[in-house]
C-alpha cells in the first residue's frame, strides 16, 4: 500500500537534499569565493544535506509500502530533475540536449512506475 502524502514529503526532501548537494559540490565552479574553502563547504552543507536524505528515505520507504528499492529510485529520479536545472541556471550548460531531456523524461517514468505500478 502506498501513502501518497509520505511519498510527496519524501520526494520534496530528496529534491532539497539534491539541491544542497549540488551547491556543496559545485559552488566552487560558480563563485570564486568557494574555490579555496572545501572544508568550510563540507562543514556547512554536510549535516543538512545528510539529514534531508535520511528523512527523505524514511518517508519514501514508508510511503512506498516499506519498499526500499522503490524509495531508492525516487531519490535517484529526483537527482535527474534537480541537477540539470541547477546546472543550466548557474553554469549555463545547455539543458535542452536530446540526451539530457531523455534522461529527465526517464526519471519521470521511473517515478511514475514506482508510484502507479501495482
Label each PLM-derived region with a short phrase.
Residues 1-118:
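Polytopic alpha-helical membrane proteins, predominantly small-molecule transporters/carriers
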Amino acid at each position: 500500500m502506498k501513502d501518497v502524502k509520505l511519498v510527496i514529503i519524501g520526494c520534496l526532501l530528496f529534491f532539497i537534499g539534491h539541491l544542497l548537494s549540488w551547491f556543496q559540490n559545485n559552488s566552487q565552479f560558480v563563485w570564486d569565493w568557494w574555490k579555496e574553502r572545501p572544508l568550510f563547504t563540507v562543514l556547512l552543507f554536510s549535516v543538512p544535506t545528510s539529514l534531508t536524505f535520511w528523512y527523505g528515505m524514511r518517508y519514501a520507504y514508508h510511503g512506498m509500502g516499506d519498499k526500499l528499492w522503490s524509495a531508492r529510485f525516487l531519490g535517484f529520479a529526483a537527482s535527474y530533475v534537480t541537477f540539470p536545472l541547477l546546472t543550466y541556471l548557474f553554469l549555463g550548460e545547455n539543458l535542452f540536449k536530446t540526451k539530457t531531456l531523455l534522461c529527465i523524461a526517464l526519471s519521470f517514468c521511473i517515478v511514475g512506475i514506482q508510484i502507479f505500478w501495482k
